[in-house]
């Protein structure tokens, strides 16, 4: 509306992450809203690192955040900025407020300030004994704060607003504090730092942001945001707007918890495929399209909601069903010997890369067939359960894309385990059904033993057993809810020959098994992106 009415010439948004951790999927919602809004209206989108707190920030996170944005395709066409670049301006504006009698240096401790503001049990506020210092005295004290003459917590600069306000954020909030810490960009230049609620609107205004969109917990901060804009710039823009955070089942979004999982070695780094981080989802095999589809389906609202992670899985499953080429992988192999097939013969069958009609993929690949094959252990049963349609002694199955075979017996190891299964092939069925018209109900996948590629396959599942980790009993340890089967490692897997050249980032459907991608850190390892199917019905 403001664009159509001519109040602004273009939409300008920003994404302001604090570089103290890796971005998770909840932050993808903020990126989608801010970047997506700017893109929709041909506007500008900034990436701004909110690095006003010197204690927690690190260049490692700066680089990771930028990599995540570029991977998502959310190009910051308005530029990349740092909140710390505006420290001089923030200080200048703080002095302006002091001289106008709108800010004062307070000697109350943090706990005393909380008591005076009436933060406990909704008590009425009362003015600090130092609220009525003169502008000249406040300016002198503030400059001495900057010069390092006081200890941390000894002095604080507060905005003078409204102690009677029902909104705690308006009861003379702190806008500068003393902090002796090395800043990742500014070094030791500063020993006083602006509070987020003071720095954020200033940064937005300087960059020309028109719409400052943030999560719902900042809704009560909006009056303070507007107060800073009006009292420093005297303008009507930027405008702050809020949206509910995105929460997902069976995981945690708290940076503190995620950091603990990494530091305690419970997960394999921030990019562990079980983590809700964007780098973890990328390593798992999720795509930017699937993540933004999930965020869009979750919707924008002003009420917090918990989204089933299976909805995210449904998004990537739908995408990969169309885009992923099919390959054959045997995760728990047992040898199948075709006794009536020549020892020295190799035959190649043409197999469709993606039989899904909607994929419009008519390409095929050559798959080698030899006397000795690998099949899945679970596709054979000496004593089959009811309705078992796979291979049994005396029974027939179709080897997917190749011959019908009949099991004639098994070889066993001394411990009773199966060493090899023997069968004969109906060599007239390589290109179709048997001549006598008999029906074979079961079809199983296989890999030529002579051409197989060895691999490790990791089957990932939800990280926590509890769906709503925000609702666990107070005082309980979130780590008690870790899923002991969040990853199952399958070693000694046998993959078809074409996968020897597969690269990280490529996605495949292992037929009858799931969707997989090569791990970006460990050659010869494949990560399960998602299972082939699920009973979950995504929201429309």
Predicted regions mapped to residue ranges:
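Active-site cores that bind ATP or allylic diphosphates and position pyrophosphate for catalysis
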Residues: 51-53, 59, 96-258, 316, ...
């Amino acid at each position: 509306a403001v664009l159509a009415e001519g109040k602004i010439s273009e939409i300008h948004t920003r994404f302001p992450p604090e570089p103290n951790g890796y971005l998770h999927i909840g932050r993808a919602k903020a990126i989608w809203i801010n970047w997506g809004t700017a893109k929709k209206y041909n506007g500008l989108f900034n990436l701004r690192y909110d690095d006003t707190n010197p204690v927690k920030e690190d260049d490692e996170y700066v680089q990771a955040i930028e990599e995540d944005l570029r991977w998502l395709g959310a190009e910051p066409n308005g530029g990349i900025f740092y909140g710390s670049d505006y420290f001089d301006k923030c200080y200048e504006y703080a002095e302006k407020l002091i001289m106008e009698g709108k800010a004062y240096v307070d000697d109350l401790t943090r706990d005393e300030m909380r008591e005076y503001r009436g933060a406990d049990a909704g008590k009425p506020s009362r003015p600090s004994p130092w609220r009525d210092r003169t502008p000249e005295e406040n300016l002198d004290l503030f400059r001495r704060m900057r010069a390092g003459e006081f200890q941390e917590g000894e002095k604080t600069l507060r905005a003078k607003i409204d102690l009677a306000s029902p909104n705690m954020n308006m009861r003379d909030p702190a806008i500068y504090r003393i902090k002796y810490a090395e800043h990742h960009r500014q070094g030791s230049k500063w020993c006083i730092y602006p509070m987020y609620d003071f720095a954020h609107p200033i940064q937005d205004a300087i960059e020309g942001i028109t719409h400052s969109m943030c999560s719902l917990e900042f809704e009560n901060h909006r009056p303070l945001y507007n107060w800073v804009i009006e009292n420093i710039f005297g303008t009507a823009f930027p405008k702050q707007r809020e949206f509910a955070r995105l929460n997902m089942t069976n995981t945690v979004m708290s940076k503190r918890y995620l950091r603990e999982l990494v530091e305690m070695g419970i997960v394999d780094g921030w990019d562990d495929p079980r983590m809700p981080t964007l780098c973890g989802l990328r390593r798992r095999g999720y795509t930017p399209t699937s993540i933004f589809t999930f965020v869009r389906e979750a919707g924008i609202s002003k009420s917090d909601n918990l989204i089933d992670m299976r909805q995210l899985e449904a998004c990537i499953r739908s995408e990969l069903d169309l885009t992923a080429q099919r390959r054959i992988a045997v995760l728990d192999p047992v040898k199948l010997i075709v006794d009536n097939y020549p020892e020295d013969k190799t035959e190649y069958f043409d197999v469709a890369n993606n039989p899904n009609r909607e994929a419009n993929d008519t390409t095929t690949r050559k798959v080698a067939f030899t006397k000795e094959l690998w099949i899945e252990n679970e596709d054979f049963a000496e004593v089959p359960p009811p309705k078992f349609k796979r291979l049994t002694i005396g029974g027939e199955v179709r080897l997917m894309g190749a011959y019908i075979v009949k099991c004639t017996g098994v070889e066993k190891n001394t411990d009773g385990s199966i060493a090899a299964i023997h069968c004969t092939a109906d060599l007239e069925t390589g290109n179709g059904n048997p001549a006598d018209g008999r029906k074979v109900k079961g079809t199983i996948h296989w890999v030529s033993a002579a051409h197989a590629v060895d691999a490790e396959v990791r089957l990932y599942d939800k990280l926590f057993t509890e769906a709503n980790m925000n609702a666990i009993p107070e005082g309980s340890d979130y780590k008690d809810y870790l899923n002991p089967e969040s990853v199952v490692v399958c070693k000694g897997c046998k993959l078809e020959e074409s996968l020897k050249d597969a690269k990280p980032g490529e996605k495949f459907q292992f037929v009858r098994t799931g969707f997989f991608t090569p791990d970006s850190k460990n050659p010869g390892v494949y990560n399960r992106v998602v299972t082939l199917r699920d009973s979950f019905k995504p929201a429309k």
